[in-house]
Amino acid sequence: MVVTQLSLEFRFQGKKLRGFSCELTRSPHGVLPESVLSTTCQVAIPILLSGLGMMTAGLVMNTVQHWPVFRDVKDLLTLVPPLVGLKGNLEMTLASRLSTSANTGQIDDRQERYRIISSNLAVVQVQATVVGLLAAVASLMLGTVSHEEFDWAKVALLCTSSVITAFLAALALGILMICIVIGARKFGVNPDNIATPIAASLGDLITLSILALMSSFFYSHRDTWYLTPLVCIGFLALTPLWIFIAKQNPPIMKILKYGWFPIILAMIISSFGGLILSKTISKHQFKGMAVLTPVICGVGGNLVAIQTSRISTFLHMWSTPGVLPVQMKRFWPNPCFTFCSSEINSVSARVLLFLVVPGHLIFFYLICLVEGQSVTSSKIFVLLYLMAGMMQVVILLYLAEVMVRLTWHQALDPDNHCIPYLTGLGDLLGTSLLALCFLLDWLLRGRANLAELVSELVSVPP
């Protein structure tokens, strides 16, 4: 596929045209043509793999919630959604940036590829270290407000576990993302479709496992008071090294200067989802909350990240920052246009929506097979769960269309500014809607049991 771009520049003095310049560029690189079937196949398999990974992460969380450290340090449960969401934000924005670079041919040159990869990885490490610490602080603040306890030993444990988890997970998943994007480019597959969900298939599991292991290790060595502060300071001390590496790529340095607000705000949004999780996970009417939360949050986040990355790539290929194509001039498009038109981004939105119900049914069935009676499996709950999953994705896909247009109009990169907000909102929506499903199911079953009891009492002869 050959991409041809014509750039015109007019120079005026007053109202008179004094000169102009014309630049024609042709590039053999670009997005390969995709049919609905090819898009569905490319997206479906990675989404299923990511769902299995998130399901495994849910099973892990269902197990570790009973560990002594999670019972004693309640704020660890509040930390899970923002920390998992942070991992998702960093890896999804990294995947989206690398996919855009791959589709525009920027990483085909070996020297340029090394510069782009090293600087992107360094930026992710800086963001992971700093925001990992901020996530722990946010969890502590929310926990202090709710149960008014403050223990310096637990503060140090929480901060150190969060920083190490964010650092190691970002490093491992960043390397994985790089391999996936380069491999996808070589095999002629659109990285936008597969990079994010494949990384997510291991991301949640890796993040939760590292958090559980690190927090348990420091909890078992809590008598050595200097251990946690020393380790935390050591990881923070590596930050200048990552900044030095990132400086080799000036466009990436802009992310370090201006890309903090989306990541931090997304972390704060996810923290409220974590607060909901910590308040509901131990109550009997929310049985199964721990195992289903990573699935519903992860599926919604992955689907909206894929759509955002595709729209961003489309704009990078066919427009310039600050200028929206004719068919995308409206900031608040009609929802029918977003989901029902023949435009390429609308087609991909329909494909992603089509995957929601079958995907959730498969994951729910597998969870019930593994967990058995520990997960509510009534018909009412399954219906409510599917409705919640569909509602979450519809809202996120529409907001993705709106936010990408707004950020592009402001000459901002949607890869860096949209995905964090949307995945953070996806975590909050997913956790809230899932808790509502459990609550409605409990109320409806309670009413049905009450009606059955009343009918039995009425039918008993005096």
From Swiss-Prot:
Catalysed transformations (reactions):
Mg(2+)(in) + 2 Na(+)(out) = Mg(2+)(out) + 2 Na(+)(in)
Bilayer topology = Multi-pass membrane protein
Q: Which UniProt keywords apply?
A: Ion transport, Magnesium, Membrane, Mitochondrion, Mitochondrion inner membrane, Transmembrane, Transmembrane helix, Transport
Q: Which organism is it from?
A: Rattus norvegicus
What is the purpose of this protein?
A: Na(+)/Mg(2+) ion exchanger that acts as a predominant Mg(2+) efflux system at the mitochondrial inner membrane.
What is the name attached to this protein's record?
Answer: Solute carrier family 41 member 3
Q: Where is the signal peptide?
A: none
* Transmembrane spans: 41-61, 121-141, 163-183, 194-214, 225-245, 258-278, 351-371, 380-400, 424-444
